[in-house]
């Protein structure tokens, strides 16, 4: 991936706020997982039910460790860290200290390790996992253009990368403890 001035500017804004960016699945809104103010901004922007929680994206399991219950078996940690051919979100036991902003009312936390170059760049340059959610208002279709982003969010986003390089399919979701696929 070529790191251009737009990506560097997105990184700058990601450190303190909410950006719109392509992911390995859909066009999304993102912020640092360790920034409660930005997480609350996403909840407010999307008019999102706070009981739902978010997906955490990371380029490596090390970025997810502060959020996952450390009592999970080493076998499950190995499975979580293993690369997958298809974008796969795992539901994992959450840390006892986890902010309710991240998992909502859920007993499990949604996490995805991705080799997406943009997410990798963001994680490695911030030292943090990212919150990920679709770029839409709750119950509406995902934005696929800057015009739709403006309709949904006005000028509330800190920065927007163009939605020109994403896959339009959501990830599959698997409960890591039971192996049951829910999407």
Language-model-detected regions and their locations in the chain:
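Active-site-adjacent structural elements in enzyme catalytic cores
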Residues: 1-183
């Amino acid at each position: 991936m070529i790191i251009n001035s737009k990506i560097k500017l997105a990184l700058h804004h990601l450190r303190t706020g909410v950006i719109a960016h392509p992911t390995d699945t859909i066009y999304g809104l993102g912020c640092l997982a360790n920034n409660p103010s930005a997480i609350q901004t996403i909840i407010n922007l999307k008019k999102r039910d706070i009981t739902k929680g978010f997906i955490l994206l990371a380029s490596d399991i090390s970025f997810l460790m502060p959020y996952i219950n450390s009592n999970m078996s080493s076998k499950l940690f190995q499975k979580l860290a293993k690369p997958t051919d298809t974008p796969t979100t795992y539901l994992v036991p959450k840390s006892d200290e986890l902010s309710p902003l991240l998992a909502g009312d859920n007993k499990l936390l949604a996490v995805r390790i991705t080799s997406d170059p943009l997410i990798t760049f963001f994680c490695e340059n911030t030292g943090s996992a990212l919150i990920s959610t679709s770029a839409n208002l709750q119950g509406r279709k995902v934005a696929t253009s800057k015009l739709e982003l403006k309709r949904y969010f006005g000028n509330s986003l800190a920065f927007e990368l163009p939605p020109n390089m994403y896959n339009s399919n959501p990830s599959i979701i698997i409960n890591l403890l039971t192996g049951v696929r829910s999407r």
